[in-house]
Amino acid sequence: MITLLFLLVVGAQAQHEWTYSEGVLDEKHWRLQYPDCGGTRQSPIDLKMKKVRYNPSLRALNLTGYGLRQGEFPMTNNGHTVQISLPSSMRMTTSDGSQYLAKQMHFHWGGDSSEISGSEHTVDGMRYIIEIHVVHYHSKYGSYEEAQNEPDGLAVLAALVEVKDYAENTYYSNFISHLEDIRYAGQSTVLRDLDIQDMLPGDLRYYYSYLGSLTTPSCTENVHWFVVADTVKLSKTQIEKLENSLLNHQNETIQNNYRSTQPLNHRVVEANFVSHPHQEYTLGSKLHFYLNNIDQNLEYLRRFIEQKITKRKKEKYWP
């Protein structure tokens, strides 16, 4: 009887699209349909500075073909995020000589009035505003489809995004301006003359490295992660545009599309630097981080209340 009920539940879930926090197949239940999501080598994780192991043999990543490129780059709203397809001529060579070919680039963000930060990886428990993933597959495999099921098949270059009072990041202008063209899930457009390297942090020399998984179903545990220590800087206007432009398959705004951090389970996180080269972890810096988040949360709460008041006024006069 129990087995029958389990099969009925799994069968019902198979008819649903996976989500992060709502519905039958939310994050807590991914593992029922995608067993790897319940594995012991899952991503993302919290990068705890005191537990990161310094490895002086880790050299800087070598990125080839990431600069300004002529041509067309398909960009799609897949119902979970915005995804940019990349040519395999973009390559990343790691410290051990492994070469990975680029497949796609996508983003994770917050946006909900009660939680604005949306990075997947956190640093000492602190969540950044956005996280960028450039997904690659090992060059020894003929395609991404072949590599995605191999134990050493994938690598992801991740970058965290900060927002304060920065001016507009012009390297993102082309990307941001085309979000309105893919508002609905399933819609696609084309970006032209894209420079991926300029969309990444200015200093790519320093990074954290560990073995993990894809952060969305099927959560396969075959990903070598490289999380860059430096950050991308975007303006508040650019952040808000990304957070509020796209709709999912239920025509709801795509927000908080990030997975919770997963247990490290005795894995080792390495870095090719002794101390964080771009941020001092002092009491003052942490206080500034939290005060900045409180300020932004209050602004989102104000806007949320204004929207509710406006909606109630409309319902009162136009029943």
UniProtKB/Swiss-Prot annotation:
PROSITE patterns: ALPHA_CA_1, ALPHA_CA_2. Zn(2+) binds at H106, H108, H133. Belongs to the alpha-carbonic anhydrase family. Its main location: secreted. This is Carbonic anhydrase 6. It is an enzyme of class 4 (lyase). GO terms for cellular component: extracellular space. It is found in: Secreted. Glycans are attached at N62, N251. The active site is at H80 (proton donor/acceptor).
